[in-house]
Amino acid sequence: MQEKKSGGYTKKILVVDDQRSQLKLMKKMLERIGYMAVTVDSAEEAEYILRGEESFSMVITDLKMPWLDGLNFCKKAKILDPNLKIFALSGFLYDFDMNELEDAGFDGIYEKPISKAQLAEILNVGIEKTRD
């Protein structure tokens, strides 16, 4: 569990999913364990945010979204910041080529729905990789 700094959270995570129910769930789970979650319902909006001055410890994104999917979002985000840790979530992993997902630069790929234990694993892997 993350300790909160005085007046705020220690880590800020961008969560991208076109399903608002998933965004609410992820935000609630992350905030309960001391992370700040910024949620957006499109990869285009997430890309716009990443181009700004706000920085994030990591990104957790859905793969199957309209217009810009998670795979192409990851490629664009890695161009903006090659060190940004990005984790994919999808209920439709069978629709994707795992090699292509790994080549895009994802730091982890998980099937929805994720458990609290899997979320903890994502956070631990992301934080450890951030420290490297």
Show where each model-derived region lies.
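Non-catalytic signal-transmission and effector/linker regions of two-component phosphorelay proteins
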Residues: 1-12, 115-132
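Two-component/phosphorelay signaling modules centered on CheY-like receiver
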Residues: 20-38
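Acidic catalytic/metal-coordinating carboxylates
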Residues: 41-45, 69-73
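Active-site beta3 strand of CheY-like receiver
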Residues: 54-60
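Receiver (REC) domain active-site loop signature in two-component systems and cognate sites
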Residues: 65
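Alpha4 helix (beta4-alpha4-beta5 surface) of REC/receiver domains from two-component response regulators
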Residues: 72, 93-109, 117-121
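A Lys-centered signature of the CheY-like receiver
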Residues: 112
